[in-house]
């Protein structure tokens, strides 16, 4: 079944989230970031760039770079690119396609369905345009959900025992919403909403940009507003300055070579304090008050009735906004349970889960996302628990030693899909010591993997001969970053042939070494009973196999091993015939070629050194 995702299609940044094991996960994009800039650019060669790559080249490609397209949704605005008029829906679809691709890359499967959020204050035309953008992007839009409703879901406030009134104050990059919701008994009801679809962080950025243009013009008599490349650099610097002023009381904006005059290059160097910034944007803060008051009035409640305040959107990180919300709500502290940039997408993925029947009162059985196993001789990954096994689960397998009188075995635990252990994620290592001296292949060591319902891995190794046991617990055994999980699965497919060849080589070598060892032991124990000609033939082929094992030619090893196995079989047959002729029932081995030894052997790393 194709997966459903939740998407926050934002003015400045967009986020995609998915439910995994009933829990929402924000998906990192191909660049490794959890938020994707809502920027689309058209390169000169016709390539469409989306996100961070589009934002990075904006300075040198101003004419063909589009940002904040959400502000044009539901209007007849168009942008001409290479003689083609692009609508806001088409441009938004490029962003949605990027999010869809990143989600598919992360999940390793097709994403067909999506819940997309919009500001609560979006009208029908804007909502329809958003649905169309999803359709253009190849998504089946399950539902358009109001951002405040999604935010309330994400905060998990719907799990409260008593009825609660929630204020969601959502100030994003380009839109502003205030919503009051009543939540209780699993029902989320929007009581009122108000807002401004053209008020957001972009407006605060613009005030800094205007201030820089005015300051530079006063100093040098040059209007940077008429220089598109300079203006783009100013906008980027303004956004950074705004973010810095949320953390510190002053910032410096330094842009060397911003433009040039007859005298030479000119540089911009301006300091800005938080107090100045708040003074020049005070009217924007004032614009936030009326929607709040309107929402409270429409809901028919008193400010004192508000139980929780939820801040949504990156712009709510500005100290002036936090202070405003505190003042408007009578000193109530905002709930800081979820990242304001991600909360809406998280809520959207929960809503997608509700619509797909994934979120309800049912038992959710988790699975381990990657195979678990240990490294055995030849560097092979011997899997005990395959990926997608439902947990809790327990698996055991018996291994043996690789050397005579091996005093200990080292258990190296790996997680991943590659055939060779080195290419998988190493989770841990422990040693089972105190093994009594014994020939290789004789000890029986039982390795057990046990994953509990919390996904915690317990590994134990027990010598069945002595009862000696050693164990370890791996916390977060399945808690790999999802990027690693998908990379491993993709690598496993991409390098499957290469891995298979390596595994075959290791197994061929293991079998050849076992054959050499067992043949040598057989000759030592029964040499005087074997016909000289037969013995000579076996010794010759044994020498050939020893030489092949010392080299790297797998085909030569296989050929020499087959020849020795055939000669050994003939030797065993000759012995039985001789015994029958002598009428003696002397015990003898039925041939050394196939001792009951597990091929996947554990090498003691210390022994090798």
UniProtKB/Swiss-Prot annotation:
Induction: By stress conditions e.g. heat shock.
Disulphide bridges: none
Phosphothreonine sites (modified residues): 175
Compositional bias of kind Low complexity: 572-584
Gene Ontology terms for molecular function: ATP binding; ATP-dependent protein folding chaperone; unfolded protein binding
Region feature (Disordered): 572-609
Segments of skewed composition (Acidic residues): 593-609
Record-stated family: Belongs to the heat shock protein 70 family.
Function: Acts as a chaperone.
HAMAP family: DnaK (MF_00332)
Name assigned to this protein: Chaperone protein DnaK
Native source species: Frankia alni (strain DSM 45986 / CECT 9034 / ACN14a)
Gene from which this protein is expressed: dnaK
